[in-house]
A protein has these predicted regions:
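Domain-level detector of nuclease and nuclease-like folds
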Residues: 29-33, 43-210
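Sterically constrained small-residue positions within well-ordered secondary structures
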Residues: 8-10, 21, 171
Length: 210
């Protein structure tokens, strides 16, 4: 009997997931990455052009991710045409690289219910929806700070954004991302339990814009 129950549990979730079509989800997660920190932990080692000082990147768009209240869809069979090279290159001003734009479409955009043009347009609108705290661009040296300071700055800069609607992540001792939860019409909403996992680092590194 226990074996039967275990088998049901193991196979129930994928079956339910298959019933969810592209465009059928609960809310979005907008992921903003602090580019200088990504470059320090990952990009410099890759020789990424995103890290060239001429770009002056601060908070860039990592992606706009369809989300369930528990879990998330990815790599959906949408039947939509993939983006053209010109479409992915057009996103580099806010995403840093055409490769990231392509990957985000393939992994997350295919689950949005939009075609590539619509998904990128919505991603750009979501990015513009958020006021990115200006104080971080004024840094002229690397500092250590609690992750909660970054969260507080976003809360102060964005009227209507509540603590349960944002989470700050860290990677390799650096502030990595601000993740903000939005409705389909880009209003602030609470994040699900699997999204709200704040970084607890009290001395996270934050490097200045290059």
């Amino acid at each position: 009997m226990r074996l039967c129950v275990l088998i049901v549990l193991l196979f129930a979730t994928p079956a339910l997931a298959q019933d969810r079509r592209a465009g059928d989800f609960d809310y979005y997660v907008l992921a903003l990455s602090w580019s200088p920190n990504w470059c320090a932990t990952t990009g410099d080692a890759r020789g990424s052009d995103q890290c060239n000082a001429r770009h002056d990147h601060g908070w860039i768009l990592h992606g706009l991710w369809p989300q369930y209240h528990r879990g998330w869809p990815q790599f959906c069979q949408s039947g939509k045409q993939p983006p053209s090279r010109s479409q992915t290159h057009a996103m580099t001003d806010i995403m840093g690289s055409p490769g990231l734009a392509w990957h985000q479409w393939k992994k997350h955009g295919t689950c949005s219910g939009f075609d590539a043009s619509g998904y990128f347009a919505l991603s750009r609108a979501a990015y513009a929806r958020i006021t990115r705290p200006a104080a971080f661009r004024k840094l002229n040296e690397t500092v250590r700070l609690p992750a909660r300071v970054v969260e507080a700055a976003f809360l102060k800069a964005n009227k209507g954004l509540e603590p349960d609607g944002i989470t700050i992540t860290c990677k390799q001792g650096h502030i990595a991302e601000a993740r903000i939860c939005l409705s389909g019409d880009l209003q602030f909403v609470p994040c699900g339990a699997d999204v709200v996992r704040d970084c607890r680092d009290e001395r996270a590194l934050f490097t200045p814009v290059r």
